[in-house]
Regions:
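Short, small-residue-biased leader/transition segments that mark boundaries at the very start
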Residues: 1-2, 252
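N-terminal Rossmann NAD(P)H-binding glycine-rich loop of SDR-like oxidoreductase domains
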Residues: 7-27
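Rossmann-fold cofactor-recognition segment
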Residues: 47-59
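NAD(P)H-binding glycine-rich loop region in Rossmannoid oxidoreductase-like domains
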Residues: 57-96
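Conserved Rossmann-fold NAD(P)-dependent oxidoreductase catalytic core, especially the SDR/UDP-sugar
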Residues: 77, 102-145
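Conserved catalytic Lys-bearing alpha helix of Rossmann-like short-chain dehydrogenase/reductases
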Residues: 98-104, 138, 149-157
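NAD(P)-dependent short-chain dehydrogenase/reductase
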Residues: 158-213, 219-224
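C-terminal substrate-binding subdomain of Rossmann-fold SDR/epimerase-dehydratase oxidoreductases
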Residues: 207-209, 215-325
Length: 325
């Protein structure tokens, strides 16, 4: 087992972290999973359930102090500005995304920690093969700072493993769909927002064109993938970092059609966001995840059909409880 005793999740208040923290705590124990985020306000629930530290991941001195305080041996670096948000301020995106990762890797090197940091379909660009994108392929045609940061992160993670022996591991996440945390500036956000608007008002305005295929994944599969990779026998990991993982690929019309099976009056129209559309057009339609399946047994449980059933049920529960308006 990789997790020896103490886990630190940096950027715990984001879309992935807000669900990964309780997931890991349920497996390894509340006191063995420390959540850290720049915003204590948005992490109240996490802080009430287990150890929490307020941390700007660019503050290497405080970051190191937290690692030493808790005897951390596994770091999850989830700090990032997402694709569409990053295009509004590319310098800030670079400084945050690469600065947090560099600190994480250096602190891991100095304190004998393993590191997980997520990559993304955003690591691919417009000249990458669009369908069944291979594990190892061209990544020199990125058109977003988010993608540039992801490619840099993949290379840095490989470098710290090869040069310093840091146990680095990562996956290339597709768009992630969740009912727990609202999306925060990503190109695939429409695939979450559509479920909320379906429940709220029975209609949705989509900001990417019909026929725009992108890989997507339901959050429970994403959480399981993280644990499965981090628990994997290192001798089996030929790639180690940046594994393609896939679950489903669809375009907006298909998700709308699936929703109509449960809400027949649901309507959708389009108002295209040119920034998000350009980003989506540069990404793969689907990824080949055969390396993840072969090297550590990756296999998703959710497809568009059973995910839609669960999302509609869970979002309606939130609506009925007054948790969303």
């Amino acid at each position: 087992m990789l997790f020896r005793s103490k886990i630190l999740i940096v950027g715990a208040g984001g879309q992935i972290g807000s669900e990964l923290v309780p997931h890991l705590r349920s497996i390894y124990g509340n006191n063995n999973v420390v959540a850290a985020d720049i915003s204590a306000e948005k992490c109240k629930v996490l802080a009430e359930a287990g150890p929490f530290e307020e941390l700007n991941a660019l503050d290497g001195e405080k970051y190191t102090a937290i690692v030493k305080k808790y005897g951390i041996d596994t770091i999850f670096n989830l700090v990032a500005l997402l694709s569409a948000t990053g295009e509004k301020n590319p310098v800030l995106a670079w400084n945050i995304n690469i600065g947090a990762l560099t600190n994480s890797l250096n602190i891991a090197k100095d304190n004998d920690c393993a590191v997980f940091t997520p990559s993304s379909i955003g690591a691919f660009g417009k000249d990458t093969p669009k369908d069944k994108t291979p594990q190892d392929t061209l990544q020199r045609s990125n058109t977003t700072i988010y993608g540039v940061c992801k490619v840099t992160g993949e290379l840095l993670s490989d470098y710290y493993f090869n040069r310093f022996g840091v146990d680095t591991r990562s996956v290339r996440f597709p768009g992630l769909i969740s009912y727990v945390t609202l999306p925060g500036g990503g190109t695939t956000d429409y695939a979450v927002e559509i479920y909320y608007d379906a429940i709220r008002r029975g209609a949705f305005t989509c900001n990417v064109k019909a026929g725009t295929y992108m890989d997507m994944m339901y959050m429970p599969d994403a959480l399981n993938a993280v644990v499965q990779l981090m628990e994997a026998d290192p001798s089996r990991l030929k790639h180690r970092n940046s594994f393609n993982i896939a679950a489903m690929s669809f375009e907006p019309g298909q998700i709308a059609a699936e929703i109509r099976k449960h809400l027949p009056d649901f309507k959708m129209d389009y108002q295209i966001d040119p920034v998000k559309q350009a980003i989506a057009d540069s990404w793969p339609n689907s990824m080949d995840d055969s390396c993840a399946r072969e090297e550590w047994g990756w296999k998703p449980e959710y497809n568009l059909q059973n995910m839609t059933v669960d999302m509609l049920v869970k979002v309606k529960e939130k609506f009925d409880k007054g948790l969303i308006k």
